[in-house]
C-alpha cells in the first residue's frame, strides 16, 4: 500500500495495492483501492478496485468492486443525521457503480451500476 504524506489512517485495515492520500477511519480497504487527497472514508468497506476521488466523503457505506466516487461527492451519512432511526441505514453501491462529481447518495440507499435504486 502507498500512504501519502497527508494521509491519516486510524483503526482501519488497508490491503496490498491501495493508495491512500486522504483520511480513512474505522474502515476496511480491499486490495487496489484508492482514496484521493482530501477525501474521507469512515465506517465503510471499499471492495477491490474502488476509487474515492479527491474531496469525496464516504460514511457508513459498502462500496462495491470497481466503483468510482467522483470529486466532492457524498455517499452515506452518520446515524445521528436521521430524524427517525428507521430512516437511517448503510448506503450500498453495487459493483461498477459510478457516482458523479458532487453527487449525493443518501443513507439507506442501494444503487446498482446503472444508477437505479434497488428496492429492498
State each model region's role.
Residues 1-120:
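Left-handed beta-helix
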Amino acid at each position: 500500500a502507498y500512504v501519502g504524506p497527508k494521509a491519516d489512517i486510524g483503526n482501519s485495515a488497508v490491503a496490498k495495492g491501495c493508495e491512500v492520500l486522504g483520511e480513512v477511519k474505522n474502515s476496511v480497504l480491499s486490495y487496489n483501492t484508492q482514496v484521493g487527497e482530501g477525501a474521507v472514508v469512515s465506517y465503510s468497506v471499499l471492495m477491490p478496485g474502488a476509487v474515492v476521488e479527491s474531496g469525496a466523503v464516504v460514511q457508513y457505506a459498502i462500496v462495491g468492486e470497481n466503483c468510482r466516487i467522483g470529486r466532492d461527492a457524498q455517499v452515506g451519512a452518520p446515524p445521528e443525521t436521521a430524524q427517525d432511526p428507521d430512516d437511517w441505514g448503510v448506503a450500498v453501491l453495487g459493483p461498477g457503480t459510478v457516482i458523479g462529481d458532487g453527487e449525493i447518495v443518501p443513507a439507506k440507499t442501494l444503487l446498482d451500476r446503472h444508477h437505479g435504486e434497488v428496492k429492498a
